[in-house]
């Protein structure tokens, strides 16, 4: 199938799917074609994702989940991205999503948006509200985290895990 989330064609990224997410067309076309494909991509990535993280990605509705912190580090030539997230519901609280051996990190839009307009969580000021998370596995794991206000984060990595 190739990489659905970040298809490389001649060196250019094709991100029509995430841009479509923020339009009125999404509600009309997503149930028929895109959501089933996104679910298939997540199922194919399941073998590479720890069970607790897979449960979070598969069953959670992200509109009440917030990114509190984004940290990018490099150690021994490997890049690591950590996102601290918080969900309003008590079952998740604060957790850290860790992306190991990151070979690609891209942000579309400002990482921090002063004009962000969403209901704030009770504990602190977040970087953004997570609208959805898409994961796919081809040669590497590819993750697209869609934030409010047409912003998104892309990562291509060897491993994803959930830290508490």
Where are the regions a protein language model picked out?
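Surface-exposed, interaction-prone regions used to assemble/regulate multi-protein complexes
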Residues: 1-164
């Amino acid at each position: 199938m190739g990489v659905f989330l970040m298809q490389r064609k001649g060196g250019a990224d094709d991100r029509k799917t995430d841009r479509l997410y923020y339009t009125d067309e999404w509600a009309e076309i997503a149930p028929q074609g895109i959501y089933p494909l996104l679910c298939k991509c997540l199922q194919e990535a399941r073998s590479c994702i720890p069970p607790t993280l897979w449960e979070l990605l598969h069953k959670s509705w992200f509109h009440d989940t917030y990114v509190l912190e984004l940290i990018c580090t490099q150690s021994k030539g490997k890049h690591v991205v950590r996102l601290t997230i918080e969900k309003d519901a008590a079952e998740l609280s604060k957790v850290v999503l860790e992306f190991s051996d990151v070979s690609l990190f891209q942000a579309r839009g400002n990482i921090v948006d002063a004009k962000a307009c969403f209901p704030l969580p009770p504990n602190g000021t977040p970087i953004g509200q997570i609208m959805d998370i898409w994961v796919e596995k081809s040669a590497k794991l590819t993750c697209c985290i869609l934030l409010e206000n047409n912003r998104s984060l892309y990562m291509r990595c060897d491993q994803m895990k959930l830290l508490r």
